[in-house]
């Protein structure tokens, strides 16, 4: 199946893998990732970092998918989870803030803040997974929807399941 318009966060996470990026920056209309579902807790603070995005219950945190099923913080965190799997950190920033990327880098000491602007210290940093999977395995897992089946003998199954092997020459 093809990616549809609205799957931009998913598409971006695939491009992180394809390009070999070292950092995934995802801009949003929100100020960052909130510590709780804003529908249930409007006073929830912004998380400045997430150590293990794979451990988050995204449905609980974001209230599930958005009404159209794409976009929103749910989609951004799914994309961040994918990037984390290959060892790439994600920075979720409010895209409407002037010079937000340069200001975020200035806050980290990477560069100077643009003239007339203070370093930006908002947004959410999503840490990479401690044990990243190889980019090739990521590509196999997410590049397309699986279809069909493969029958292998017991020896091949053992090699695939326990040794992380390949049946390709």
What are these regions (language model features)?
Residues 1-169:
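C-terminal catalytic "cap/lid" subdomain
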């Amino acid at each position: 199946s093809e990616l549809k318009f609205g799957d931009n966060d998913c598409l971006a996470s695939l491009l992180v893998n394809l390009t070999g990026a070292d950092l995934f920056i995802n801009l949003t209309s929100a100020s960052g990732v909130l510590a709780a579902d804003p529908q249930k807790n409007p006073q929830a603070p912004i998380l400045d970092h997430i150590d293990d995005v794979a451990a988050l219950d995204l449905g609980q945190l974001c209230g599930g998918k958005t009404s159209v099923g794409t976009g929103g913080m749910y989609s951004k965190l799914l994309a961040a989870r994918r990037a984390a799997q290959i060892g790439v950190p994600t920075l979720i920033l409010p895209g409407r803030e002037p010079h937000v990327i340069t200001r975020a880098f200035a806050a980290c000491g990477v560069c100077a803040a643009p003239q007339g602007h203070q370093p930006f210290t908002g947004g959410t940093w999503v840490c990479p997974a401690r044990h990243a999977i190889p980019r090739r395995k990521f590509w196999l897992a997410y590049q397309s929807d699986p279809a069909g089946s493969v029958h292998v003998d017991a020896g091949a199954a053992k090699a695939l399941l326990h040794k992380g092997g390949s049946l390709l020459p």
